[in-house]
Swiss-Prot record:
Keywords: Cell inner membrane, Cell membrane, Ion transport, Membrane, Potassium, Potassium transport, Symport, Transmembrane, Transmembrane helix, Transport
Organism per entry: Klebsiella pneumoniae (strain 342)
Protein name per the record: Low affinity potassium transport system protein Kup
Function as written in the Swiss-Prot or TrEMBL entry: Responsible for the low-affinity transport of potassium into the cell. Likely operates as a K(+):H(+) symporter.
Pfam families to which the protein is assigned, alphabetical: K_trans, K_trans_C
């Protein structure tokens, strides 16, 4: 390792603490309280405390440390992670039928994330503000308004980017984790008996003693690992090593100490179950703890918001969501983006959730079902990658998958009990997003197939135009072409109605590759089809935003000189008609029409000056 790398590792590790671990790092605010609140038919009993602590500890070890940190993070696409990346990797070396199944699993996982992302900011911030109940019980009616005010400020500043305040995230979260560790260790020293719960015997004993109820109680235990997907999703920002170092050196020890510290407190003072996290702190430290807890939960919420922006961009670029405005808030960091529509849709949803559920304990009933569902899908997809891409031994992969699912499926099944009490919310939101993504992808494919049914050969048409050319006009015309060997509709209609052709015609195709970035050397491919026709294929990764001006610059370097303000861009605008279909497909067609009407137009999507664009309409039945 070079000196530079040695210097950068601590900085990247600190940055990872500030972003990646915000969600899982604020789980101690509410996890143990929900486990022992009495909802499962038992209160703060010694065996229950030991059982829950043992389950939480071994879940952190097995699911986070072994499954995600050690195994899942091996599956990267040019350093990038996330459920859609895993879906893409899993489908590379499989049959078409198997790929379709894997795509559906990946989209379900992505949809689950959208469902859970509405709950995370609400439960995190509310659980911090609820410290007011300990400091000043008379202010408990202000918890909901203050939570909304805090989150409103967070969503408002999104359009300005988080580059400046983001520099504060890491030191604040480091202070947070150190406080977790200190408060927990202080309580453990006062009652070291609690360390017996490190023995997995207590987890087994918990199931044997409480039987069926213990299985349902797993729905509360899973709160301790919510946010685990962020470790994999944010891998591209910081790299594997900093995330792993941060987990084992700071985050895991701090979480374990704090959970066991809360357990030690509850063994001596069962009445502290009202809010064991804040009651760990001495009375004089309650107000500072409330402030730092609020800041930590805001940072956790910011990480989730940034995550949903990144997932949305990836889904748009891969063709699963309609084009929408994506604003880059940093000239230095391509990952810092702002999507206005998603931002305000998420804000309204979060406010509705806070007003409806009123307390973090009520929200806890809705939390976890989407997380555990994603965990099941991640296990299946990552095992597929291990077998098909890495060519690991079939028996070993099978045993590993069984081991993962033996944890994931019971956790998911236990959370199904939450559907009536609130779990319906993330499931409903996830179902909506899955419907939207599959509708856009399938109907877009149907539309393109119909548009390409005319069957005219591009080469034959170009040859015919060169032999018997129409009237030529000076300048360059660019026709946006979705497929390489298909005549663009705009070109057909321009010849049909205007009966003219520019002196130079460029057929431009912008395509998204199965990689986060494409090197500038491979950005454009130029092919001269005839003396006056050129084909340009510009490739972008799914983390990049296509820019026609940049394409022209690269073309100039390759010998094809183009000037934006001397070029006319011809695009087709499709007016869609829904043909004869079964009723359910008609509904899907109407949803697609709605999505298309609200999609970002191509000139805005590719940053083409509006005064250089000519749109030619065509009617297509789908």
């Amino acid at each position: 390792m070079s000196t530079d790398n040695k210097q950068s590792l601590p900085a990247l590790t600190l940055a990872a603490i500030g972003v990646v671990y915000g969600d899982i790092g604020t789980s101690p605010l509410y996890t143990l309280r929900e486990c022992l609140s009495g909802q499962f038919g038992f209160g703060v009993e010694r065996d229950a405390v030991f059982g829950f602590l043992s389950l939480i500890f071994w879940l952190l070890i097995f699911t986070v440390s072994i499954k995600y940190i050690t195994f899942v993070m091996r599956a990267d696409n040019a350093g990038e992670g996330g459920i859609l990346t895993l879906m893409s990797l899993a489908g590379r070396n499989t049959s078409a039928r198997m790929t379709s199944v894997l795509v559906i699993l990946g989209l379900i996982g992505g949809s689950f994330f959208y469902g859970e992302v509405v709950i995370t900011p609400a439960i995190s911030v509310m659980s911090a503000i609820e410290g007011l109940e300990i400091i000043a019980p008379q202010l408990d009616t202000w918890i909901v308004p203050i939570s909304i005010i805090v989150l409103t400020l967070l969503f408002v500043i999104q359009k300005h980017g988080t580059g400046m305040v983001g520099k504060l995230f890491a030191p604040i979260m480091l202070i947070w984790f150190l406080l977790l560790a200190v408060l927990g260790a202080r309580s453990i020293l006062d009652n070291p008996e609690v360390l017996q719960a490190l023995n997995p015997y207590w987890a087994v004993h918990f199931f044997l003693q409480y039987k069926t109820v213990s299985f349902i109680a797993l729905g509360a235990v899973v709160l301790s690992i919510t946010g685990v997907e962020a470790l994999y999703a944010d891998m591209g920002h910081f790299g594997k090593l900093p995330i792993r170092v941060a987990w084992f050196s700071v985050v895991l020890p701090s979480l374990v100490l704090n959970y066991f510290g809360q357990g030690a407190l509850l063994l001596k003072h069962p009445e502290a179950i009202k809010n064991p996290f804040f009651l760990l702190a001495p009375e004089w430290a309650l107000i500072p703890m409330l402030i730092i807890a609020t800041l930590a939960t805001v940072i956790a919420s910011q990480a989730v918001i940034s995550g949903v922006f990144s997932l949305t961009r990836q889904a748009v670029r891969l063709g699963y969501l309609s084009p929408m405005r994506i604003i880059h808030t940093s000239e230095m960091e391509s990952g810092q983006i702002y999507i206005p529509f998603i931002n305000w849709l998420l804000y309204v949803s979060v406010v509705i959730v806070i007003v409806s559920f009123e307390h973090s304990s009520n929200l806890a009933a809705a939390y976890g079902i989407a997380v555990t569902g994603t965990m099941v899908l991640t296990s299946i997809l990552s095992a597929t990658v291990a077998r098909k891409n890495w060519h690991w031994n079939k028996l070993f992969v099978g045993l590993m998958l069984v081991a993962f699912l033996c944890i994931d499926i019971p956790l998911f099944s236990a959370n199904l009990d939450k559907i009536v009490s609130g779990g319906w919310l993330p499931l409903s939101l996830g179902l909506v997003m899955f419907t939207v993504m599959t509708t856009w992808k399938s109907e877009r494919f149907r539309l393109l197939r119909r548009m390409h049914e005319h069957g005219n050969s591009l080469e034959a048409m170009i040859s015919s135009l060169e032999k018997s050319p129409p009237v030529r006009v000076p300048g360059t015309a660019v026709y946006m072409s979705r497929a390489l060997n298909v005549i663009p509709f705009a070109l057909l209609h321009n010849l049909k109605h205007n009966k003219v052709l520019h002196e130079r015609v460029i057929l431009l195709t912008l395509r998204t590759e199965d990689a986060p970035y494409v090197h500038n050397v491979r950005r454009v491919q130029i092919e001269q089809l005839s003396p006056s026709f050129w084909r340009v294929v510009a490739s972008y990764g799914w983390r990049e935003t296509p820019n026609v001006e940049e394409v022209f610059h690269r073309c100039g370097l390759e010998g094809l000189s183009c000037r934006m303000m001397e070029t006319s861009f011809f695009m087709s605008h499709e007016s869609l008609i829904i043909g004869k279909r079964p009723w359910y497909l008609r509904l899907r067609g109407k949803l697609y029409l709605l999505l298309q009407r609200n999609a970002l137009r191509a000139p805005d999507q590719f940053e083409i000056p509006p005064n250089r664009v000519i749109e030619l309409g065509t009617q297509v039945e789908i």
